[in-house]
Each structure stands twice: as C-alpha cells, then as structure tokens.
C-alpha cells in the first residue's frame, strides 16, 4: 500500500511541473508559479543527528512533506527529501562535523594556516560518512517508495564556500591577498571533487528532480543548484571574479545549468553571478531586511539586469520582511508585489506571502498570494 496520499501523475502536479518548466525557460507570457515549500509539513531537517541513524524516521518525514506539498493549490510539486548538503564536501576534505543549537550541522576547519592546503587531500568520492549516508538513504527511499515521486537533488556548495570550511575563514580571506596560489589550489581541488560527487549523486537516483534543494524542482533536467552564500556575500566583485567565478563556471559547464542560492544581500555581486557559465536562475530572500528589491523594473540596477536574463525565485522569511516582520500580507501587498510587477515578470517564481497578519496557514497564504498575482496580471 502506498504511503502517499496523492496521485503522482495527477493533472495538478503536471500543471505545477509545466508552470515551473516555463519559468525556468523564461517563456514569455507564461503563468507565474506560486509556491510554498512548508505547506502542511515543514521541510525535513536532513542532518538531524538522531534521524541520520534512523531511515524509518527520515522516511516518515519525507512522506509527510511530499503529502503536504500535494495537499493544496501549490506549484511546488511533491518530491522526496534528501539531506542538506552544506557540510558534505567539507567533511570529505577532513573537516570535523559539529552540531550547534537545534542540531544544525557545521564544521571545524582543518587548518588555521593557508600554507597547509598543499598537504590536504580529500577522501575518495563516496567514502566520507555523510556522502555515504546520503547514498544509502537514496537507495532505501527508492526501494521503499518507488520512483514515481522524484527525489530532490542535493544542494552543491560552491567551491569557495567549501574552502571557507576547510581553512579558517579569516585566514582564507587573508590568503586571497597573501597566498592566492594556495587559495586557487584548494578551490580547484574542491571543484574537481564536487563535480565527481554530483555526477555520482545524480546517477544514484532513478528519478531526480532539478535544480534541487532550495528551489521548487521538476523532473526535467534544467541544471543543478549551487549554494553560493559565502563568496557572494563576503567577497568584493573583484575578488569574486578571481576566486569564485572560475570554479562556478566549471560546474556550470559540467552540468549544463546552475541555479544559484544565496541568503543575504548579494546585489554587489549579481553582475558577476550573471557571468557564470549556463546560469539559469537566482534565489532572493526579498524584503527590506535582507535582499531589497528596486522600486521599479526600469531602474538600472543589478536585480533588474538579472531578471531580464535569468529566472528569479523570489521568496521571503521573517528576517527579509524587516519592519513588516509580523505583517505577511502587507509586506507582499506594499513591498514585494508592486516591485515584482513593475517590470517584466517572465521567469518569476513567487513564494507565498507566508503566515501571520490574518493568514492562518500555508494554504490560505497560497490562496491569497495567487489572488493578488491574478489581480496584478490583469492590470498589467
């Protein structure tokens, strides 16, 4: 008996896939997908200490999330959760995994000295504990659930971000000035490992979904997600071009497309990001508290240059809302939607407004957001 409460081949799920595929391809005049990843059930924590050793608990949470995604008028299709990949490649380079508040996985650096990178060698791909556990989980989930529902591909961390785990971050940044050859050596090692690891990861899934974690995903191979938080935020445009862009380019070339996740305000590096080989989309936590959007679509600014070239997944959270923190609908009606609809909406993917401010649950948030999108599309 299936554990799923939905038909994976339903017309509603097929419609979600079409809307997202059109957005990622930037089809003019296509419907704007309205998505909510936390519908009915939260995204499972993929590196929870207890659940890593209990695949039945991981399975329960993965099924609950997929059922929740399918339960409402949601353009985020149901999928099987994998594991959050923030620390995976860093562990393979020797980082010790530590768990902080809320059992969030992080790392201890391998070294405090940039000169040590010449002595660092990664494990063979597939042999580090977390990557091996990820492979085992994918195999277990596919045997238990079948493959009609796609598996969410993992979030590959960009090479410079991994380097900032391996070498203490301040030392790594100083090394960009004092010993750039060592920084490039480490980033190239991480790039080579990451490409081989991601190819292995994709080969393990009979039905992967793309671009993967952080993004609403579809069965069509539109490229992979890279999480680019550290360099996009921390590096100047000049340093990003030297120490991050060449390695992201190699990943974009290898997989035919990249979709860039980053938290925070990375507007100063958007023009660099748009130079990544085969970049397909970006994610922005939109709001005055995190990633401010321009007031109009005609303004000459990095975000508007991005929206004319790639798809844009516009989402939000409590931090991004800033002074709208408890006013979910007002944040969207006064801030996000007027700015999104002041320009071309081709390629826009929009998360729901969220709960609070009279919005009792995620289904209500989806319904309200979809109505507001419909009104604005009618008036443009």
Regions found by a protein language model. Give the residues of each.
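Active-site loop segments of alpha/beta catalytic cores
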Residues: 1-52, 62-65, 73-82, 103, ...
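N-terminal beta1-alpha1-beta2 module of alpha/beta enzyme domains
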Residues: 69
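A contiguous, low-structure linker/loop signature
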Residues: 81-119
């Amino acid at each position: 008996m299936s554990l799923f409460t939905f038909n994976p081949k339903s017309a509603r799920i097929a419609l979600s896939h079409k809307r997202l595929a059109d957005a990622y391809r930037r089809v003019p005049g296509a419907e704007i997908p309205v998505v909510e990843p936390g519908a009915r059930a939260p995204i499972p924590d993929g590196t929870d200490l207890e659940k890593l050793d209990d695949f039945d608990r991981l399975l329960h949470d993965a099924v609950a999330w997929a059922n929740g995604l399918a339960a409402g008028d949601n353009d985020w299709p149901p999928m099987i959760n994998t594991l959050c990949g923030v620390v995976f490649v860093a562990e393979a380079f020797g980082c010790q995994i530590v768990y902080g508040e809320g059992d969030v996985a992080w790392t201890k650096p391998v070294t405090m000295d940039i000169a040590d990178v010449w002595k660092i060698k990664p494990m063979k791909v597939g042999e580090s504990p977390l990557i091996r556990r990820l492979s085992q989980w994918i195999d277990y989930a596919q045997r238990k659930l079948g493959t009609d529902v796609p598996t969410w591909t993992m979030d590959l961390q960009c090479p410079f971000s991994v380097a900032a785990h391996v070498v203490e971050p301040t030392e790594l940044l100083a090394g960009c000035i004092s010993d750039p050859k060592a920084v490039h050596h480490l980033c190239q090692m991480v790039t080579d490992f990451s490409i081989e690891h991601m190819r292995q990861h994709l080969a393990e899934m009979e039905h992967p979904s793309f671009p993967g974690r952080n993004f609403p995903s579809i069965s069509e191979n539109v490229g992979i997600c890279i999480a680019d938080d550290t360099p996009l935020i921390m590096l100047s445009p000049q340093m990003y071009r030297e120490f991050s862009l060449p390695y992201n380019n190699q990943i974009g070339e290898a997989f035919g497309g990249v979709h860039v996740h980053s938290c925070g305000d990375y507007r100063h590096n958007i023009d660099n990001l748009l130079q990544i080989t085969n970049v397909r989309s970006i994610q922005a936590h939109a709001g005055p508290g995190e990633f401010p959007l321009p007031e109009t679509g005609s303004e000459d600014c990095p975000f508007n240059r991005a929206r004319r070239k790639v798809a844009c997944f516009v989402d939000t959270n409590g931090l991004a809302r800033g002074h709208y923190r408890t006013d979910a609908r007002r944040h969207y009606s006064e801030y996000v939607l007027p700015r999104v609809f002041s320009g071309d909406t081709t390629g826009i993917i929009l998360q729901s407004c969220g709960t609070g401010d009279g919005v009792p649950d995620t289904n209500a948030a989806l319904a309200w957001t979809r109505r507001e999108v419909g009104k604005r599309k009618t008036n443009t």
